[in-house]
Every structure is written in C-alpha cells, then in structure tokens.
C-alpha cells in the first residue's frame, strides 16, 4: 500500500499545544467496528461504553527528561543538544546529537558533574553515547539536568506544566523518551471510578524513537520499526486468559500496549519487540483499543487502520472518515489531544 493513502488534512489550530485540565475532560470518540457508528463523549464517561469484567491494560513506563543541553568541553559557543533515544546497557545510550562537527571521541559537558562522550556514529545524527555522572547515578543526573522531550510539533519549549501532564499518573518504570499518550487522559479520579466496573492491569514498553520515527518509504510494507523493550508478566497473561474465558473484552490503552500484547500473545515476555502492525495483521489478543489522533502518514495511523479492518469494513477508510468527523467537531489532535475508543 502507498503511504499517501494514510494522509489527511488537519487545520493547524486543532493541534493541541497544551494539555486539558482535568485530564479526563478530554473528548472521546467511540467507534463501533460492527455497526460503523461514531459516538461523541468525554473520557470521564468512558465507563458507559465498557462492560463489567472488561480488562483495561495500560503502559506503566515513565518518561525521562531525555533532552540534554551542553557544549563541547573546553570550547565556548559550541552548543550541543542530545536527545536520548534508547538505553542499551550500563552507561551506553543511543541518541540523536545535534551540533557542528559531531565526531566519535567528542566530550559534551552538560554540567560540571555530568558529561556525555560520543563513542561511535550509527547513522547521520544518531550516535552511541556514554553518560558519565559524578557522585550520582546517571538517572539522577538525567532527572536533574534533562528537559522533558515534548514533541517538536508543539512549537514551544518545555514548560512547568509538561513535567506533570506529559507523564501518566501511574508512571513507574523510567526509560521512555516519549509518553504513552493514550494514558494521559486517565486521572486518579477516573481510574478509581473505572475500578468499580472493570479490571486494570499493566505492561511495560519503554517508548523509543522507534514509536514516532517517520515513515520515509513510499510502500508501507518496506517500513521498519526500531526495537523497543517490553515486559508482559505472567500474572497479566493469566488475567487476559481469565477475561477471555468469561467472554469479556481485553482493551489496550495505546499503541504501545497493543504492540506489547500482540508480541507476547499468550506467554510472559521480557525482551525487545520490533512488531510492525499494518493492514492484514491478525490480532490475537485485543478486543478493544484506546488511542489518540495520530499524525498523517505515520506508522501509528497505519496500526489503528489495521485494527479497524473487519470482514465488511475497510479500516483505513473508516479511520479517515472518523478523522474528518473529528475535525468537523473540533477535536484536538496528537499527544496532548483528544482520543478514541475503538470496539
């Protein structure tokens, strides 16, 4: 399939530049794959579309302030920006490094007690870097000096509001460089409300550059997704099997949860996944899916289209129709935007 088939027009003013408060006041579009019906609601009322005993699965990863600003050691006016993409092992990270003449061996001074050493080049502006922190571990140093890597399409720098709202309320395991945005809509109050009706569980997927890497090929079959680390526990697998046995629904909150579950399927899994979901993919775990409104021609929009494919429903056409409906009703798009529940 040609990537142009996943394009759509979006007015600039519908790109959400800031989060809504409270989180659960975001709009919710509900799509029914069987009837092709579209219903408008809010996240606070999402329980009205769920059944007693359904299982909602979230991603408990935590966003690191992965944007580090520094300068070449010993050289004035030599600003360098590092965006940590993926933790590899110990002090070693995969990172985008922006600046002039970035070469292996370069030492980047982030602070008097925190440095990055460029070890080798992977491709273009992507490098392997070693983080060296004095009198603290590297995560403490990243949290101390780093900035939240808010998406570039917000067109602004990080602000205090982002520290709270570009993080889920249940974030626990650090190492993501972007938020699992479908979960940003869930406040503590909404979670307490939901627990009275449905079951809640968690996977871990540490979001890396692979999740939001642009599709640069014309034929979507040729796109490759970078590896990301996931954890799917034995207790979650048991919970999923129990839910299925009761004829209730397993609902993934976000594309990261979707990819983790469809990688593990019916066994515990601790490792990496490069699963790329596109039209024709056969879902083995999911019965429902909560997600945001994604960028045109993105792998995430391709994934959502794949989930909407039914025997008598073209998933791509249905999703693009729903996006047109969202524009008409002034839904807010992308990371800080509104969301949809697909059943």
Swiss-Prot record:
What protein name is recorded for this chain? S-adenosylmethionine:tRNA ribosyltransferase-isomerase
Pathway assigned in UniProt: tRNA modification; tRNA-queuosine biosynthesis
Is the keyword S-adenosyl-L-methionine assigned to this protein?
yes
Single GO molecular function: S-adenosylmethionine:tRNA ribosyltransferase-isomerase activity
Q: Which organism is it from?
A: Hydrogenobaculum sp. (strain Y04AAS1)
Q: Which GO terms describe its biological process?
A: queuosine biosynthetic process; tRNA wobble guanine modification
List the keywords (alphabetical): Cytoplasm, Queuosine biosynthesis, S-adenosyl-L-methionine, Transferase
State one Pfam family annotation. Queuosine_synth
Q: What is its EC number?
A: 2.4.99.17
């Amino acid at each position: 399939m040609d990537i142009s088939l996943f394009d759509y027009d979006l007015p600039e003013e519908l790109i959400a530049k800031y989060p809504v408060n409270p989180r659960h006041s975001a709009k919710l579009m509900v799509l029914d794959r069987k009837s092709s019906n579209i219903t408008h609601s809010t996240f606070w009322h999402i329980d009205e579309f769920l059944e007693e005993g359904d299982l909602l699965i979230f991603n408990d990863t935590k966003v690191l302030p992965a944007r580090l600003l520094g300068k070449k050691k010993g050289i004035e006016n030599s600003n360098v920006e590092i965006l940590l993409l993926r933790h590899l092992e110990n002090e070693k990270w995969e990172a985008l490094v922006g600046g002039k003449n970035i070469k292996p061996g370069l030492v980047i001074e982030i602070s008097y007690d925190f440095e990055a050493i460029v070890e080798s080049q992977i491709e273009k502006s992507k490098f392997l870097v070693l983080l060296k922190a004095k009198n603290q571990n590297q995560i403490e140093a990243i949290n101390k000096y780093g900035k939240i890597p808010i998406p570039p399409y917000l067109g602004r720098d990080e602000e205090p509001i982002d520290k709270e709202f570009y993080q889920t309320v249940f974030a626990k395991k650090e190492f993501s460089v972007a938020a699992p945005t479908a979960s940003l809509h869930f406040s503590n109050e909404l979670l307490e409300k939901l627990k009275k009706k449905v079951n809640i569980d968690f996977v871990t997927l540490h979001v890396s550059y692979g999740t939001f890497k642009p599709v640069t090929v014309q034929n979507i079959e040729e796109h490759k997704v970078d590896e990301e680390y996931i954890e799917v526990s034995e207790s979650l697998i048991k919970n999923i099997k129990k839910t299925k046995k009761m004829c209730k629904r397993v609902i993934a909150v976000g594309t990261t949860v979707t990819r983790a579950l469809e990688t593990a399927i019916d066994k515990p899994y601790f490792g990496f996944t490069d699963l790329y979901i596109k039209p024709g993919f056969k879902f083995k775990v999911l019965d429902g899916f909560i997600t945001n409104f994604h960028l045109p021609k993105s792998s995430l929009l391709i994934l959502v289209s794949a989930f909407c494919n039914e025997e008598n429903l073209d998933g791509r056409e249905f999703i693009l129709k729903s996006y047109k409906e969202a524009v008409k009703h002034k839904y807010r798009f992308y990371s800080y935007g509104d969301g949809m529940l697909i059943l």
